[in-house]
Amino acid sequence: MHYRYIVVEGSIGSGKSDLSRRLAEYFDALHLTESPERNPFLESFYMNASNHALASELYFLMNRIEAVEVINVEEEKNHMIVADFLLENDQIFVPILLKDREPGNEQTLFWQIKHRLMPEMPVPDLVIYLQTSYEVTHKGLQKRNDGMLNMFPPGYLEMIHEEYGRFFHLYQNAPVLIVNGDEMDFANNDDHFEMLLRAMSNMQGSRHYLNLSEA
């Protein structure tokens, strides 16, 4: 297994943060996290999405630009990195959240700013996509008991969940290990975690699927 830069992705509530943290601990790697709770515009976005989505997405963009710098430095040092977000994940959120019509086309403005500011993005050696049903992600958010579930705008979670599926159906920039997140609990089940490690080690080609029934 010769991965230096691993990304764990999945819809909100899929368990990507827990899995990326465990992988980082296992490999003694730098854990790079998106930490949406640090976004000062996020609460305002949840209360009034149409007025605050652009500010929220620009904040995440600046974080991703900083992440590129961190990844490049760590790769130069030959250090391993495990991240809980894909640098291109704005392609999932921006089309849903920002207006794409005149006057004031926010999507166009966002992509123009990104084109000007974003350096060349490093490509992961492996992306682990936790593919979960909407019901499972919803339960995952309920278990967190942090009140976040009640803050999302109506229909937001469903749209994000659908867009994740569409995005990874088309994604070809890096090898993808697609994991059935409905069946596996990597945070609490050591056997499931070992299955994942074996699948990572045996990964061949650009796309592989891991299901509990086939592991």
Regions found by a protein language model. Give the residues of each.
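Hydrophobic anchor at the beta1->P-loop junction of P-loop NTPases
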Residues: V8
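P-loop (Walker A) phosphate-binding loop of NTP-binding proteins
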Residues: S11
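Conserved lysine of the Walker
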Residues: K16
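Conserved substrate/cofactor phosphate-moiety recognition/catalytic segment
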Residues: E25-N63
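A basic- and aromatic-enriched beta-loop-alpha substructure that forms the phosphate/nucleotide-
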Residues: R64-E102
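A glycine- and Lys/Arg-enriched "phosphate-lid" helix/loop adjacent to the NTP-binding pocket
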Residues: D90-E162
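NTP-dependent small-molecule kinase module
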Residues: K139-A215
